UniProtKB/Swiss-Prot annotation:
It is found in: Cell surface. Residues 262-273, 284-310, 317-362, 389-450 have a biased composition (Basic and acidic residues). This is Plasminogen-binding protein PgbA. GO terms for cellular component: cell surface. The gene is pgbA. Binds plasminogen, specifically, and in a concentration and lysine-dependent manner. Plasminogen is the precursor of plasmin, a serine protease that cleaves fibrin, fibronectin, laminin and vitronectin. Acquisition of plasminogen/plasmin could enable H.pylori to degrade host components. Its main location: other. Residues 363-386 have a biased composition (Polar residues).
Length: 450
């Protein structure tokens, strides 16, 4: 019990001494090296590894254009590496094309009041929460559920921080409480913490969630290394420590090159021409910014040319489509005219055939002998009777031929009408299809113009 009270007092004292890095900070950029993607600004109380983001102020709104990580602090000046802002990456939102420039503001520690806590058991978990009352610890149940039974990896922890808007992670290792930045995973602070009394640990860390299983393949790939709590997290933090040492050495080399470049730049500076007065030549920062602007303008010019080519191609396709539509209309009109002429010719043939039939019938009736002129002669009567009977036998034949001719003409007429209807149906379908294609092409052309 006495050991617990001493630990609580010690943790409270340390938390009060280190509360400054938890407070939000805003600084102005004083130097930008676009080719190297390096910026410099007053350090204040910033530490290596702290994460921030660059904000550019426009006429009536602000844009986050970059995210930064401090890589060196020397003589009150902080050096940071910047890159495109990806912490809230969203493919359905527009991507800013601006870059960091002198005068932009850098925001730090905006989410450092929220943290994840990774502890081996409930005792240390509650102890750390009680001694850091100014921090809003997100429940470890959410983090273990997010990991879904897999061992905590740096990439997964960063994703969880972005999802829950967390700025720092507290990780308990052997006799140490490590406070790391979520985005850079650099160690911001170390505090002494007695872990000698820990006899039983939770996997992958303490939480109230149980029964999460990553499955057979998950266990195969993840390895369940976090069952050995202190060995796993000691190695995880040491890995980041080695990375920190490599970054420091790299930044020392970068600083040396920057100093040489600045000395050389100062040596080759010359005054401008007399008509430009006594103004000095552009500084290295201005040249780098102008170079970046020219590169950006060239990229914009290529994009504009590509858009113009697309627009020209779409216009050409629309014109071709209109030309094809005209050809379709002309062909359809020509076919319609031919069909009408064919129908008129069929009707003319019907009239001619009807006249011929009528003339044949009249001629046959004129050739028959008159029964009234031969009424007085008996032989003539017999002959007339025989002729009448013969005429009666032959009469059905012309009538049968006429019926066949009439049926044949009706069939021709019905067939011609059916062909005309089919042609009109095809013409309507062609016209509807062409109108639909024309409307789609016009919509595509309007989209390209926009």
């Amino acid at each position: 019990m006495l050991r617990l009270l001493i630990g609580l007092l010690l943790m409270s004292f340390i938390s009060l001494q280190s509360a400054s890095w938890q407070e939000p900070l805003r600084v102005s950029i004083e130097f930008v090296d676009l080719p190297k993607k390096i910026i410099r600004f007053p350090a204040h109380d910033l530490k290596v590894g702290e994460f921030g983001f660059v904000v550019t102020k426009l006429s009536d709104y602000e844009i986050v254009n970059s995210e930064v990580v401090i890589i060196a602090v020397e003589n009150g000046v902080a050096t940071a590496k910047f890159k495109a802002f990806e912490s809230m990456k969203q493919s359905h939102l527009p991507t800013p094309r601006m870059v960091a420039k002198k005068g932009d503001l850098v925001y730090f520690r905006q989410f450092n009041n929220q943290a994840f806590l990774i502890a081996p058991n409930d005792e240390l978990y509650e102890q750390i929460r009680a001694t850091n009352t100014d921090i809003n610890f997100i429940s470890s149940d959410l983090l273990v559920t997010f990991l879904n039974g897999f061992d905590p990896k740096i990439a997964n922890l960063r994703k969880a921080c972005n999802v829950y808007s967390v700025g720092v992670i507290y990780i308990v290792t052997t006799n140490t409480l490590n406070i790391l930045s979520c985005e850079s995973f650099e160690i911001l602070e170390k505090r002494e913490l007695d872990t000698s009394g820990v006899t039983k640990t939770s996997t992958p860390f303490f939480s109230r969630v149980e029964g999460i299983d990553a499955g057979t393949l998950g266990k195969l790939f993840s390895g369940s290394q976090s069952k050995n709590y202190f060995a796993y997290y000691d190695a995880l933090v040491k890995k980041e420590k080695r990375k920190e040492v490599r970054i420091e050495k790299k930044e020392e080399r970068i600083d040396a090159r920057e100093n040489k470049r600045e000395i050389k730049q100062e040596a080759i500076k010359e005054p401008k021409k007399a008509n430009q007065g006594t103004e000095n030549a552009p500084t290295l920062e201005e040249k780098n910014y102008q170079k970046a602007e020219r590169k950006f303008d060239a990229k914009e010019e290529r994009r504009r040319s590509r858009d113009e080519r697309k627009k020209t191609k779409a216009t050409k396709k629309a014109m071709e489509f209109e030309e094809r539509e005209k050809e379709h209309d002309e062909r359809d009109e020509k076919e319609t005219e031919e069909r009408r002429k064919a129908l008129e010719m069929d009707k003319g043939n019907e009239k001619v055939n009807a006249k011929e039939n009528e003339r044949e019938i009249n001629q046959e009736s004129a050739n028959e002998p008159s029964s009234e002129n031969n009424a007085t002669l008996k032989d003539t009567e017999n002959t007339s009777v025989l002729k009448e009977s013969a005429a009666k036998k032959e009469a059905p034949k012309p009538s049968s031929k006429e019926e066949k001719r009439r049926l044949k003409e009706e069939k021709k007429k019905a067939k011609a009408e059916q062909r005309a209807r089919e042609f009109e149906q095809r013409a309507r379908e062609h016209q509807e299809r062409d109108e639909k294609e024309l409307e789609e092409r016009r919509k595509a052309l309007e989209m390209n113009k926009k």
